[in-house]
Amino acid sequence: MRTFNLFRKEGDGSHLDDSERSWHRSRMIALCVNRRVAPQRVLQHGGDESYVSASPLSAVALGASLYLPATRPDLMMIANSQKLPGLRSVIFCTEDAVSGRDLERALDNLAALLPKLETGPLLRFIRPRNPTVLWRLLQLDGIERVQGFALPKFGPHTLGDWLRVWDDSKGHRLLPILETAEVFDHRKMEIMRDRLEDYGLKARIVCLRIGGNDLLNLLGIRRRRGATIYDTPLRGAIADLVRVFNPAGYRLSAPVFDYLDTPEVLIREVEADLQHGLVGKTAIHPAQIPVIESCYRVPREDYETAAAILAPDAAAVFKLRDSFCEPATHRRWAEGVLERARVFGVVAGPSDDH
């Protein structure tokens, strides 16, 4: 079995060659999805009306988010897209990926990095270890150059701690991580949803991230090789979170996939993520990113169906390709499909080969 160590910290930076090779190799792995992407073009959904994303920083735009320990010596090159240039979003971690003895080094690394961050398409977030570390990060020069923060162990019992240090004036967005035992309590999740609304945080939240490994740890479980997260007890918890948060307008992103040598299982899991209404996924290695994002490409049939549903002159009920379409009940699905198509493209169908 091959092993990859994303968290190696050699000082000369040459170790990224392996990651870069894996990055390009993984583009070949992604071909096992057996899909071809249609040429890029302006997306339309009726007449000459173009579909426009509701927000330039959306849960969909994050794609596969790569976690990196903030102790890495090559953080600057990745943050400024000199390494892994195809990356859509990155989260610099000062929590689980950094030992307590290395925390100050991680913060020093970020303090040196932030003023030198260049403008570009890469979406950059920081995962603070705790509210105290968040407060320290907010004092750093250049902190306004990151898009926001992924808040770990987020729940009703920690919400007040985060809010006490939160500075809303800098325009940062939030990625709260749901990974405590409270996730298994339906009522507590409803309470937290209501508190987010009461405190006016909803507009700041890009998505709520599901911390799969922390939740499995609470159950004393690690998924076996070949299993998706939906083959574990978390299937019910994920469905419950979707039922609590999605109707209120929040988006949920999917947990990490632990294995690097079973891309076919990763593909199966991402397809199940989408079926459960999840958007985006955390990646533990660059090799996973093209595999994950290949699954986000929209099948042409779905794209054309979504465009027809959102057309201004769409009938109240109609049939398309032997499927029942009702704009009043399918609108949110259709909007999500066109958002994915805008970001990741449309998968060509058989008719496009002629």
Indicate where each model-derived feature is located.
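Expand to "…catalyze enediolate/carbanion chemistry for C-C bond making/breaking, isomerization
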Residues: 2-354
